[in-house]
Amino acid sequence: MLLSSIAQHLKLPFFGEDLELDSMNELALSLPSQLTFAINKKYSQELESSKSKAFLIIDTLVENLPKESSYIICPDVSISMAQATKLFNKRPIEPQLPSATIGEGSMIDSMVRVENGTCIGSNVIVMAGAYIGANCVIGDDTTIYPNVTIYRDTIIGKECIIHAGVVIGADGFGFSHTKEGEHIKIYQNGNVIIEDCVEIGANCAIDRAVFNSTIIRRGTKLDNFIHIAHNCDIGEHSIFVAQTGVGGSTKLGRNCVVSGQSAFSDHLNIAPFSTFSARSGVTKSIEKSGGVYSGFPLMNHKEWKRLQVKIARLND
């Protein structure tokens, strides 16, 4: 898509060369063929070192652009970014893609729908009522139970188990907000990657990323009714007990243990080998690995136990 076409859709002028762009990405990860954006002055240094050649920016950041950049000056970059994501959004069904392929020894129930462009490996089992969207990859020896929904572009590794009712790749919950209180959808143009030997319990929901990938890494086990929001990165061999929720763009290191009904805020970084007791409320990043935590606000588990003793004695 030409930058001039994007500018026309946004009803804003563009400056510089009229570049051909194939997608969007966040500033730190953007490539020369991608449109990116900088919402405020906080991103001035990232802007100067960006590999992208096309930008949505506020006027005060023009001086920070790399040489020979093309750009659109936006009164509200957040709104313009949301509007631009719609232009790069892929259709859920693409008839022009080649027919799906199914590996040797796989058993696909007659009540399963598999869209074009999808590749299913060997010895895969897909049970009745499942839906697999366009351009997905399902690894060898994976089992998909009834009524699982897998949206387009999802990649699932080998020897995974996906239990009934799971939804993988639905849109992340992302909106930009106008001054008038309207909510402008940020189209989620990334995907979900499930690495090898992952088990996902019944009725879990794992949202697709805005631009790149939501990742569940090798060997991780999810209990039932768990929500993983867009852009999350869940470290390998982690365990999540039922009814846990992880906010967008939060990253957990390997071998974390998260007990039931715990919740994580967005944009956190959690150190490897961290353990959280039931109903933990995690609102800040954790840098030290191997810690055990409880409560809300979150605290060291031993401290939390001492606090519970003191609370129990308040009426004495």
UniProtKB/Swiss-Prot annotation:
Single GO BP term: lipid A biosynthetic process
Pfam family, one: Hexapep
Primary enzyme class: transferase
Catalytic activity: a UDP-3-O-[(3R)-3-hydroxyacyl]-alpha-D-glucosamine + a (3R)-hydroxyacyl-[ACP] = a UDP-2-N,3-O-bis[(3R)-3-hydroxyacyl]-alpha-D-glucosamine + holo-[ACP] + H(+)
GO molecular function: N-acyltransferase activity
Keyword Transferase: yes
Pathway(s) annotated for this protein in UniProt: Bacterial outer membrane biogenesis; LPS lipid A biosynthesis
Keywords assigned by UniProt, alphabetized: Acyltransferase, Lipid A biosynthesis, Lipid biosynthesis, Lipid metabolism, Repeat, Transferase
Record's keyword annotation contains Amino-acid biosynthesis: no
Catalytic residue positions: 230 (proton acceptor)
Record-level GO cellular component terms: membrane
EC number: 2.3.1.191
Family annotation (HAMAP family): LpxD (MF_00523)
UniProt similarity note: Belongs to the transferase hexapeptide repeat family. LpxD subfamily.
Function: Catalyzes the N-acylation of UDP-3-O-acylglucosamine using 3-hydroxyacyl-ACP as the acyl donor. Is involved in the biosynthesis of lipid A, a phosphorylated glycolipid that anchors the lipopolysaccharide to the outer membrane of the cell.
Subunit description: Homotrimer.
Protein name (database record): UDP-3-O-acylglucosamine N-acyltransferase 2
Gene: lpxD2
